[in-house]
Design a protein with these regions (language model features):
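Alpha-helical packing segments of well-folded alpha/beta enzyme cores
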Residues: 21, 56, 60, 199-202, ...
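Glycine/tryptophan-enriched, flexible segments
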Residues: 120, 141-284, 384-388, 392-440
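Short charge-dense sequence patches
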Residues: 3-15, 32-39, 58-65, 189-197, ...
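Active-site-proximal binding-pocket segments
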Residues: 221-403
Length: 440
């Protein structure tokens, strides 16, 4: 009897637990080829994410080897390399996780055309979100534009069954697994390590604090958030598994997971979210000020809470969610600069950088996106005093101000002249028009 073979193409689903495409292939086929194709074009976008990716691939390879298989690694055009390997091993077809980005859709179209040409199947599976994009549709539309009704509908969905990791995986004989390059250095010295095993340990360690999530997640100095976002972005942990471990679908933490699903279904219906204002008629009279953009990027705006957030981003490849809101609001609402360059800076540094969630969040803050109040502004001083009341977060990331006590650190321009002159810290950036209320 001829043994049946299938290829599973990994993309941003770098795990063996709750991986529908992998589980289906192992169940239906005698031999399975887990494959990842390193795309040189994508590797250049973010040294931080490239390092995290390579660490995650090494962890995935180890998990597959423990189960008798291996991760086959190739380098080049993902479609060409996948089809080439599938034909070489005599695969009947290819399975992979469905995705919503333009890049993913282009890959899918090309794969489908090649599979049709070579008489192979191409099957897409869920797994990148908890509820599949497109599974929920409002009356008269192809996607929800406002979060609250989406969340209500999302809460009522019967979720798919969470899948165990395969016990055994068998590769075809003679397949060269290929070399996985050593992880590159990356740009952020304190960036988290990638991999499913790291993600599962982090989730287990953090879960005991879940009951206090609503009280502690905005404490910038305490930093008691899950920090799971890079692992969700790369699929090192299943969002369904995280939701199941959290339990309460009405709770504030699971609500944040739902926001992730929400933006995936938005991008499925509006694929230009990373480049085009979502809100029809949105005003976009942005200023052009390269000096201000550079100062914001480097964390030297003279606004301590903003500079602290941007320096954390550069040091860790991650930023506290409250700091993301403050820094993005400062760029767009105070400096009056376009959200798109801000998005690109985040995308360059963030381990969890992706076009779906980052774009949705930036547009929300800028007033051009979903479920937004276009004239909402973030007072950075008020935000700092509320979420970093003693200034510990600022002093951690802006050492020039470590001698400034208490909440005075949030407004160094109000210090006595002699004290202020002794600090190696710039004054707040000047912008055209009247000074905002927090500088008066």
């Amino acid at each position: 009897m001829t043994e049946r073979t299938a290829v599973v193409l990994f993309t941003r689903d770098l795990r063996v637990h709750d991986h529908p495409a992998l589980a289906a292939a192992v169940s239906a086929f005698d031999r399975v080829v887990p494959l990842y194709v390193l795309d040189p074009a994508l590797q250049k976008l973010s040294p931080n994410r490239t390092r995290f990716l390579h660490q995650s691939l090494a962890d995935l390879r180890e998990a597959l080897r423990k189960r008798g298989g291996d991760l086959v690694v190739r380098r080049g055009d993902p479609v060409a390399e996948t089809v080439k390997l599938a034909r070489k091993v005599g695969a009947e077809g290819i399975g992979l996780s469905a995705d919503v980005s333009r890049h993913a859709h282009r890959r899918e179209r090309r794969l489908r055309a090649e599979c049709d040409r070579h008489r192979m199947f191409l099957r897409l599976f869920p797994g990148l979100t908890i509820v599949e994009p497109g599974a929920l549709r409002p009356a008269g539309g192809d996607h929800y534009r406002v979060f609250s009704p989406y969340f209500r509908a999302w809460q009522g969905v019967r979720l798919r069954e969470e899948l165990a990791a395969p016990k055994r995986i068998r590769l075809p004989e003679g397949v060269d697994p290929g070399r996985l390059p050593d992880p590159p250095k990356g740009d952020s010295p304190d960036a988290a390590e990638g991999g499913e095993s790291v993600a599962r340990r982090r989730l287990t360690t953090w879960l005991p604090t879940l009951g206090r999530y609503d009280d502690i997640h905005d404490d910038m100095a305490g930093d008691d958030t899950s920090r799971l976002s890079p692992y969700l972005r790369w699929g090192c942990v299943s969002p369904l598994a995280v939701a199941n471990r959290a339990g309460d679908r009405d709770g504030p933490f699971v609500r944040q997971l739902c926001w992730r699903d929400f933006y995936h279904q938005v991008v499925a219906g509006f694929p230009d979210l990373s480049t085009t204002a979502y809100r029809r008629g949105a005003r976009e009279d942005w200023r052009d000020d390269p000096h201000a953009l550079e100062a914001w990027t480097e964390g030297r705006t003279g606004m301590p809470i903003v500079d602290a957030g941007m320096r954390q981003l550069r040091a860790e490849g991650w930023m506290h969610n409250r700091a993301r809101l403050i820094t993005a609001g400062y760029l767009t609402k105070h400096l009056g600069l376009d959200w798109r360059p801000g998005l690109e800076v985040f995308f360059r540094w963030l381990l969890d950088g992706d076009r779906v969630n980052n774009s949705g969040n930036w547009q929300w803050v800028a007033g051009t996106g979903n479920d937004t109040r276009p004239y909402r502004g973030f007072n950075p001083v008020r935000q700092a005093e509320r979420y970093d009341p003693d200034g510990a977060y600022v002093r951690r990331w802006v050492p020039e101000l470590e001698s400034v006590p208490g909440k005075a650190v949030h407004q160094p321009w109000r210090l006595p002249d002699e004290t202020r002159r002794a600090l190696d810290y710039p004054p707040p950036l000047e912008v055209p028009g009247a000074d905002p209320v927090w500088l008066r």
